[in-house]
């Protein structure tokens, strides 16, 4: 019996150890967070984006349709499109990368073809755009060399000596406290100036706060 005790003790020890829970020292994989859903505001082809314009081919050949992403007024990332001059493509992309990083809210970015090339309707919708073939004698928009951002929040306001003219868009009021509006030292304004754009706030006859041009 005494000879069996060590054997029984060994078997008992093995049984006890086998019942102990095993510890897995391997790190459990961390589930990757799902990317934020992007809301698509428009998805035109180039042909669709210039459909119905009165611009001659010599002008439309200078244009390019690009995608941009931005936070809209709902706090979500949206994707829109800008029809602009090829000379501005790199700068517009850089500006919108900055706008996205700053989380500066942009209502929507849709080519004006959606509004049948009616600039007033586009502005009433607070729509951001570049090319619109109008006022060809002086408007940089006629060649896609300008961009208007949140025009309803940043309306064109005539200076006192020209107050007999109507501000645009109609019924819009400038309030710099509202998100999406510009002021002289606003980071987005400074970024556009850094990129070589002229800001409409400094025009001789009016304060065209939504307008940046080259």
List where the protein language model places each region.
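Bacterial N-terminal signal peptides that target proteins for export
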Residues: 1-8
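C-terminal motif of bacterial Sec signal peptides marking the signal peptidase cleavage site
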Residues: 17-18
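Active-site acidic/histidine clusters and adjacent loop/turn architecture
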Residues: 58-122
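Catalytic cores and adjacent binding grooves of peptidoglycan-active enzymes
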Residues: 135-138, 143-214
